[in-house]
């Protein structure tokens, strides 16, 4: 009789994504994956972020609970409910403050719904203690891979950069399976007393107290670092990616991350790609947060034109009558050869198109996984966050991309590389595009990333490494919910 009762019960998981597309998109996919394994999944988000999840809720894959975002109380503009809208360092601090102010409201929602588990973004450091109050496990979601997690932990623990003579002097990151060299200029720089730095420091200690970590990666991509994270750093972790593979239908891929209703047929860029030869087009996109200075955009435009390669370029700029960031006559000369998209683009569908030969990326983890999954080589251009670590995985460990020469971590997401010192020159862009698209090196790089892409697909299939890890986690959470107590 007890077994019958247990089988009738359904595991209910709450998901709390950080309010930024790069965090919300993969956590939505993760909720869909848990749902496909029989769990009831509820995402908690704010009113202005709700449209991001509307398609999944309409299909009945997930449920949605709204929570008020305290923009005004934190000193933010009333409609600022996403980190994608942050334009200054001061706004970043206020946004972090706002994420702490929602804690009591979230606690009330938990009390009302009583889920069996909480999956919360790493930026919500308070979520572990809140989950403990309700005697449910809190799972961490970082939004990056094992390599970056290991590298950042080593840098924070050992401080190998503290006694260098200059920002450009290199150092070896200690206690890693490979010899990885970096410079101080490539590391995150936040004032010690900033809200963001306080949160990062607290996150390490709180992560150790959480039930475990969900990682959007697959074992075959970073086996040494998956083992290192678990055995050397002692973290309990499950690899369940690439989570984007949960979107199997064309419509799901087209709508992923879009607030507007969107279908593949509506995207002219896909029709444009249909007219191109296989592996002939360079796709250029720097994610949802990076806003380059006009001077850097001019270098990109000139470098792309000089390369002679066809391209699709996603630019976060509204069209104006006079655009100083474009070389004179650029769009006229590039007709049929280059396509500029000034809005959201269906990235997964673009990368999966046979015409795409390379991807110029900011090395956000979602973008790297999507490129690997599609078997597309990369030109790496890290900007902030853990992106300089991610670049090392791509260019040195797997050799599935070439660096463009970005050397300086950006403190602000806006007007990136406005100063001459950090700007990537057109010659470097042209050279990187040529390296990744033409010659023997390009062929070898493409072969390596294609093999990884096949491994990625196998990992999420029944019996694959990610499928098995997710199944084991769901089984463990069911046992905790219906057969035991949180350890």
Swiss-Prot record:
Listed InterPro entries: UDP_glucos_trans, UDP_glycos_trans_CS
Amino acids binding UDP-alpha-D-glucose: 345, 347, 362, 365-367, 370, 386-387
Free-text tissue specificity from the UniProt record: Strongly expressed in achenes and receptacles.
Keyword 4Fe-4S: no
Database matches in SUPFAM superfamilies: UDP-Glycosyltransferase/glycogen phosphorylase
Binding-site residues, an anthocyanidin: 23, 385
Keyword Iron-sulfur in record: no
Entry-linked PANTHER family: GLYCOSYLTRANSFERASE, SCOPOLETIN GLUCOSYLTRANSFERASE-LIKE
Protein name per UniProt: UDP-glucose flavonoid 3-O-glucosyltransferase 7
The species this protein was found in: Fragaria ananassa (Strawberry)
Upper taxonomic lineage: Eukaryota, Viridiplantae, Streptophyta, Embryophyta, Tracheophyta
């Amino acid at each position: 009789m007890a077994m019958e009762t247990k089988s009738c019960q359904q595991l209910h998981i709450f998901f709390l994504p950080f309010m930024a597309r790069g965090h919300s998109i993969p956590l939505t996919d993760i909720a869909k994956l848990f749902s496909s394994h029989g769990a009831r999944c509820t995402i908690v988000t704010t009113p202005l972020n709700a449209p991001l999840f509307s398609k999944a809720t309409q299909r009945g894959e997930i449920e949605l609970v709204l929570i008020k975002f305290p923009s005004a109380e934190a000193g933010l503009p009333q409609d600022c409910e996403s980190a994608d809208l942050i334009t200054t360092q001061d706004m970043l601090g206020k946004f972090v403050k706002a994420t702490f102010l929602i804690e009591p409201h979230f606690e009330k929602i938990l009390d009302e719904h009583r889920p069996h588990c909480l999956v919360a973004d790493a930026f919500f450091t308070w979520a572990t203690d809140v989950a403990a109050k309700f005697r449910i496990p809190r799972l961490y979601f970082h939004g990056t891979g094992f390599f970056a997690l290991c590298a950042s932990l080593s840098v924070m623990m050992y401080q190998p950069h503290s006694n260098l003579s200059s920002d450009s002097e290199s150092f070896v990151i200690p206690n890693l399976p490979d010899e990885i060299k970096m410079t101080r200029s490539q590391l995150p720089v936040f004032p010690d007393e900033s809200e963001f730095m306080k949160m990062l420091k607290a996150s390490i200690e709180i992560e150790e107290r959480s039930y475990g970590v969900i990682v959007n990666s697959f074992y075959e991509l970073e086996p040494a670092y998956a083992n290192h994270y678990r055995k050397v750093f002692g973290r309990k972790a499950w690899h369940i990616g690439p989570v984007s593979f949960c979107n199997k239908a064309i419509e799901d891929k087209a709508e992923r991350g879009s607030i507007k209703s969107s279908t593949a047929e509506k995207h002219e860029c896909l029709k444009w790609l249909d007219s191109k030869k296989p592996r002939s087009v360079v796709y250029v996109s720097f994610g949802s947060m990076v806003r380059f200075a006009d001077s850097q955009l001019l270098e990109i435009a000139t470098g792309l034109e000089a390369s002679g390669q066809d391209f699709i370029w996603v630019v976060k700029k509204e069209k104006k009558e006079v655009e100083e960031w474009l070389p004179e006559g650029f769009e006229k000369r590039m007709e049929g050869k280059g396509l500029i998209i000034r809005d959201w683009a269906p990235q997964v569908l673009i990368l999966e198109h046979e015409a795409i030969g390379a991807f110029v990326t900011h090395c956000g983890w979602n973008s790297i996984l999507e490129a690997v999954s599609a078997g597309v080589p990369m030109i790496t251009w890290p900007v902030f966050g853990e992106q300089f670590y991610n670049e090392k995985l791509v260019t040195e460990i797997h050799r599935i991309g070439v660096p463009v020469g970005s050397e300086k971590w950006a403190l602000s997401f806006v007007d990136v590389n406005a100063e001459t010192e950090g700007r990537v020159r057109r010659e470097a862009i042209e050279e990187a595009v040529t390296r990744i698209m033409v010659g023997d090196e390009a062929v070898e790089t493409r072969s390596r990333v294609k093999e990884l892409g096949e491994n990625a697909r196998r990992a999420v299939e029944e019996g694959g490494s990610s499928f098995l890890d997710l199944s084991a986690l769901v089984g463990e959470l069911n046992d905790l919910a219906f057969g035991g107590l949180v350890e």
